[in-house]
Amino acid sequence: LHMIHLHWYQYPPMNPMMYPLLLIFMLFTGILCLAGNFVTIWVFMNTKSLRTPANLLVVNLAMSDFLMMFTMFPPMMVTCYYHTWTLGPTFCQVYGFLGNLCGCASIWTMVFITFDRYNVIVKGVAGEPLSTKKASLWILIVWVLSLAWCMAPFFGWNRYVPEGNLTGCGTDYLSEDILSRSYLYIYSTWVYFLPLTITIYCYVFIIKAVAAHEKGMRDQAKKMGIKSLRNEEAQKTSAECRLAKIAMTTVALWFIAWTPYLLINWVGMFARSYLSPVYTIWGYVFAKANAVYNPIVYAIS
């Protein structure tokens, strides 16, 4: 009880019908996510042609998403069944930590996937090819930095607390002290605004490079009086462009999923009167459901 902010006590209990809806939604997304990401990992690890340095990043993304749902899904089912957090204060902190950790690892893995596409498509032969050693180093950097940021609340820089209808736990965005808020300012920059800026920058140049390449191909085909100039090299470039589109889709879905939860954090800091348990819990659940999208995107592609 000492971890629950007084803001949540002013609201009446949530409509009992909401809990079965949350339970069904989490059951559906949990099974879909665990199965989809497991299949993604299995296929990429057991298909020789897919065991490339770039796909190590894809496997890391699937592992991060799998871990998120594996740790979020069962506790959420329990708390929705009992209509409140029943797993104790320690597990609340662990739960909040793991959710933040996996979300942070996912977006920075996507940033490195985007950067690899930028290197291949924009820089071309001038770019340094991604090696297994370099991809492994990137993955190590992702997890070390994510761990460092997400462990900070355990040492007094912000904290993990129950939120919304008290069936989930996350960072404390209702405390007004400057120390707690400073963490959210910096963390928002680190896991949202900076990745978004890098991604937009890379894809602006990727789109320009692809458009220039396609125009060059069409012009050359016209000069030669043929319909298409799709030789082996062109087919390879086309495949790289498809991979860039897949990466862009996964990144876009991540930002669509996590933007409502970011807004909840900032509304909690500056306009908490607009923050209700219903909006908060659905924003929270929608963000976690992002772990479902990636295997679907890769399967369709």
From Swiss-Prot:
GO terms for biological process: phototransduction; visual perception. Glycans are attached at N165. It holds the Pfam family 7tm_1. A motif ('Ionic lock' involved in activated form stabilization) lies at residues 116-118. The modification N6-(retinylidene)lysine is found at K288. GO terms for cellular component: cell projection; plasma membrane. Photoreceptor required for image-forming vision at low light intensity. Can use both retinal and 3-dehydroretinal as visual pigment. Light-induced isomerization of 11-cis to all-trans retinal triggers a conformational change that activates signaling via G-proteins. Signaling via GNAQ probably mediates the activation of phospholipase C. Belongs to the G-protein coupled receptor 1 family. Opsin subfamily. This is Rhodopsin. The lineage of its organism: Eukaryota, Metazoa, Ecdysozoa, Arthropoda, Crustacea. The gene is RHO.
